[in-house]
Amino acid sequence: MTKKDIRVVNIVVSSSLGQDIPLEKMAATLSNTEYNPEQFPGLVIRIKEPKTSALIFNSGKIVCTGARDLDEVQRSIKQIIKSLEKINIKITIEPKVTIQNIVASGAVGMDLNLNVLAMKLQNTEYEPEQFPGLVYKINVEPKGEKVLKATFLLFSNGKVVCTGTKSEHQVHQALDALIENLKKVK
C-alpha cells in the first residue's frame, strides 16, 4: 500500500515594488548583493533569515526563491524593503506576490521499477546513463477546475520531486494522480 508523504521545499514568486530601483546604488552599499549588469540585468540579494534569494530588476520587479511557505515569502519581501530603506529608497506599496512555481519532495511509499514505468506511462523521459530519475509529466483534471500540469522526478526508492504547481493543494492533487497512475501500472 502506498503512503503519501510530500512537503514544499521551495516556492518561487514574482512581485513588483512599484517603482524603479537604482541597482548600482544597492550593489555599492549592501554587502549581501551581487550585480554584474554585463552578464545579467538583475541584482541578486541574499537574505539570511529566512534563507532566500531574490533577483531585483531596475523596473522594481522581483523574483524570490528559497522560501518554504508564504510566511517566509512575506518576510523575505519585507527584508528587501528594509534593505532599500537603508539606502533611502521608500517603498510605499504593499507588494502583491504571485506564485510562479512550487517544488515539493517526498515519497510514494513503495519502490518503483523505472524501466517498467518508462514503457507503460505516457509523457516520460528516462535516461539512466545521464540521470537516475525518471521525468514524468502529468496532466490532472480536477472536477470543476482547469487542467493542472505538474512534472515529477521519480526515483527507484520511491522518492519523488514535484514541480510546476502553484499551490500546496495542487501539489497534493498531482501526487494523488501520480499514485493512481502508479497503481494502474502494477
Specify the residue positions occupied by each region the protein language model found:
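Intrinsically disordered, low-complexity polar/charged tails and linkers
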Residues: 1-159, 165-186
